[in-house]
Amino acid sequence: MNWITNYVRPKINSMLGRRTDMPENLWIKDPETGEMVFHKDLESNQFVIPSSGHHMKISAKERLKYFLDDGRYEQLENPKVVLDPLKFRDEKRYTDRLKDAKAKTGLEDAIVNALGTIEGLPVVVTVQDFAFMGGSLGMAAGDAIVHAFEVALQRKRPLILFAASGGARMQEGILSLMQLPRTTVGVDRLKEAGLPYIVVLTNPTTGGVTASYAMLGDVHIAEPGALIGFAGPRVIEQTIREKLPDGFQRSEYLMEHGMVDMVVSRLEMRQTIARLLKMLLKMPGEQKPLEPEILPPAVVAAEARPQA
């Protein structure tokens, strides 16, 4: 039986041109409802599940493709930094973790910077990729964010930042924490120049990034259902020994309590941010041309007649 299964059947399938492999992730499960969604339907809907509206995590490059005009952009080269300055090792060496993350994502680190346009408006866009070590903030990510602010200042462009992070990168210790004040200075310089800075908080945005650049925007937009906060809900419950309210630290809860300005679907993000940029840049909105009012001759004659 093994000979038939392992040799004869594959040989017949090969001769007949049959496909014996099933593509991975052909069907994707909705984490909220358990519904199975065909991957092509999900891709065409920007990885927002049509029935429930659940926003799946997406990569930095997918984010740029969906967000910018025609999916076209120029990716900026990030500054080079010293790898593993502390020679850190836990269960694995930090350098090995970096190699694994690079192989998994195709990125050099968690930040991707790009130049592009939104409805014709030139912008600088910074995206954190959660798939790269949880989007953690280290020296490379910090330098990349500071570089994005510098490019925005040089080119006099607004900056839009998509945050997705678990916080500071523990393998870099105090060097990671130093990125909090560095990025904050970058935000201040952009604001002094009068350039808009819009932050989009995606799932999840936690830890040190919420104590720095991620909560310093002119406008804060959150994707639906995103977890946003400094410490996670489990840590808070264990610390205060109390049950947290339903939806605590989720986008909708934070908007109700004034922590974010609006909750916007990924499908409407481009139009919303373009409208905000036009307002912040004091650009004239689209106005319909005035239609001339044509009056009947009798009315014109009556208005022209001198009054007694």
From Swiss-Prot:
Ranges for domain CoA carboxyltransferase N-terminal: 26-295
Family classification: Belongs to the AccD/PCCB family.
Keywords tagged on the record: ATP-binding, Cytoplasm, Fatty acid biosynthesis, Fatty acid metabolism, Lipid biosynthesis, Lipid metabolism, Nucleotide-binding, Transferase
Cellular component, GO annotation: acetate CoA-transferase complex
Protein name per Swiss-Prot or TrEMBL: Acetyl-coenzyme A carboxylase carboxyl transferase subunit beta
Native species: Mesorhizobium japonicum (strain LMG 29417 / CECT 9101 / MAFF 303099) (Mesorhizobium loti (strain MAFF 303099))
Subcellular localization(s) per the UniProt record: Cytoplasm
Top enzyme class: transferase
Disulfides per UniProt: none
